[in-house]
């Protein structure tokens, strides 16, 4: 899918603005959305974002904050302070709900780092994520976050099945921050240059994300033949997704959709897919 003509964005107008004064609005979707949504979308071109709605506002990160944890791991691989075959011992505090791969695991078990990263990204396994947080540490992960230019993002707690209301928003991020991270990863992979990691690490992270098992949001709004490397995040009133769309094409793009205060969380999947469909269709039309 060729996407060589780019759009420009305006948060104030809540619209996708392609060149030549045409406007493809997303305002109707934003205003009818049953909650609060933040959007960030851009291509690899050195242009303003295609769409930027609440792009710098903080949202509960949910599992999307597992992306900078992944980056921390791959940077450790590059420094040779860790390898995918190194084993991590599960601690009592790592055990929690939301673990489709490590659900039967118990403290004291040992798991390879490579297996933990795959479970964290592709299955959003919380025990795997907690084990990586415990192993690499909050300080190192937040240093990765800062060095990637993610100024509105913070990892402040482990993942838990039931989170008290006052602690739900301790892990925070912004649509722009996640977009900046995915842009850097895709640019490194696509252009073969060092960005937040080496080109080889960036390609490996894209490949890992392409194995994502949860495809109900952004992927559901894009034609099925288009490859999508994405990471989802969910809390009780949060459904979010962040993706590199068509990462191997001439014109990949980044799309981040973060939400909060959803009135009907179960219906948000289709709503988010509708945003993805609108934006993707706009990009394709402008390429004709």
Regions flagged by a language model, labelled:
Residues 2-21:
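N-terminal export signals
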Residues 5, 22-28, 33, 50, ...:
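Structured C-terminal helix/loop/strand segments within mature extracytoplasmic catalytic/sensor domains
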Residues 18-60:
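Beta-lactamase-like hydrolase cores
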Residues 34-36, 54-56, 62-64, 83-85, ...:
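Extracytoplasmic
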Residues 36, 130-190:
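Mid-domain, small-residue-enriched loop/turn segments at the edges of structured enzyme/sensor domains
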Residues 60-88, 120, 255:
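Active-site SXXK
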Residues 81-111, 140-160:
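Active-site helix/loop module of the DD-peptidase/beta-lactamase fold
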Residues 95-130, 138, 171:
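Conserved catalytic neighborhood of penicillin-recognizing serine enzymes
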């Amino acid at each position: 899918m060729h996407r060589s003509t780019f759009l420009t964005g305006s948060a104030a107008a809540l619209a996708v603005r392609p060149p030549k004064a045409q406007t493809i609005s997303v305002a109707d979707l934003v205003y009818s959305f049953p909650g609060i949504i933040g959007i960030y979308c851009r291509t690899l071109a050195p242009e303003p974002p295609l769409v930027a709605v609440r792009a710098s506002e903080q949202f509960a990160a949910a599992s999307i904050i597992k992306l900078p944890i992944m980056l921390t791991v791959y940077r450790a691989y590059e420094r040779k302070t860790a390898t995918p075959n190194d084993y991590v011992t599960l601690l009592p505090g790592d055990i929690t709900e939301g673990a489709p791969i490590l659900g039967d695991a118990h403290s004291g078990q040992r798991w390879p780092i490579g297996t933990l990263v795959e479970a964290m990204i592709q299955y959003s396994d919380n025990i795997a994520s907690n084990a990586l947080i415990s192993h690499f540490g909050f300080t190192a992960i937040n240093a990765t976050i800062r060095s990637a230019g993610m100024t509105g993002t913070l990892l402040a707690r482990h993942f838990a099945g039931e989170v008290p209301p006052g602690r739900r928003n301790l892990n925070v991020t912004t649509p722009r921050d996640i977009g900046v991270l995915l842009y850097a990863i895709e640019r490194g992979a696509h252009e073969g240059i060092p960005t937040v990691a080496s080109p080889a690490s960036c390609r490996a992270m894209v490949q890992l994300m392409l194995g994502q098992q949860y495809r109900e949001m952004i992927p559901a709004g894009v034609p099925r033949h288009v490859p999508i490397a994405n990471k989802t995040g969910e809390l009780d009133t949060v459904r979010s997704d962040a993706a590199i769309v068509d990462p191997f094409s001439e014109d990949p793009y980044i799309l981040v959709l973060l939400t909060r205060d959803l009135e009907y969380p179960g219906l948000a999947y289709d709503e988010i897919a509708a945003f993805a469909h609108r934006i993707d269709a706009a990009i394709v039309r402008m390429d004709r």
